[in-house]
Amino acid sequence: HSMAHKLGAFHHLPHGVANALMLEEVLRFNSAEAPVKMGTFPQYDHPKTLSRYAEVADSLGLAGTTDEEKLESLIAAVNALKARVGIKPTIRDYGIDEADFLARLDDMTEQAFDDQCTGANPRYPLMSEIKQMYLNAYYGGRHFEEPPMPTAADFEPAADPHDFKRTYRKAGK
């Protein structure tokens, strides 16, 4: 939801369309095998989104024997529904200029990270993960995949030691 807030604000897309454009990436991100949550909530010891998404697929009568297969069936059903109601497959398909999208991407990513809804997500994203989901939703055809765990070489000192959000820099980018 946080990402849709900013996608709509930066690129003048209706909020429902922005949510629909981000949904597949967010479903994949939230259903990670080894999810991490930086906050604690009494209703769960860790996010159980993959099994919850599988329950949704079961309720809809979708195919699959494993939770992963059910997730893929759920995503296929969501994408089919989006197509039936006229939601285009990618952000780019809405006429958002690539240069403009890329020029605003870092600000949009940071604002999505800081959005009040981010803390309520079952899995707390890194800014680099938000950025990758935006890119995937813009270009289409790629999906969120767990990045390798960072090593010491992936970090550099921040100019401002209080600016912890900008300390992590992916090596080679």
Where do the model's predicted regions map?
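Short alpha-helical scaffolding segments that buttress acidic/His motifs in well-ordered protein cores
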Residues: M3, L23-L27, V78, K82, ...
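Glycine-rich phosphate/pyrophosphate-binding beta-alpha loops
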Residues: S2-N19, D114-A120
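Gly/Pro-rich interdomain helix-loop hinge
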Residues: F10, V17-D100, H143-F144, M149-A152, ...
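Short, amphipathic C-terminal "tail helix"
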Residues: D100-K173
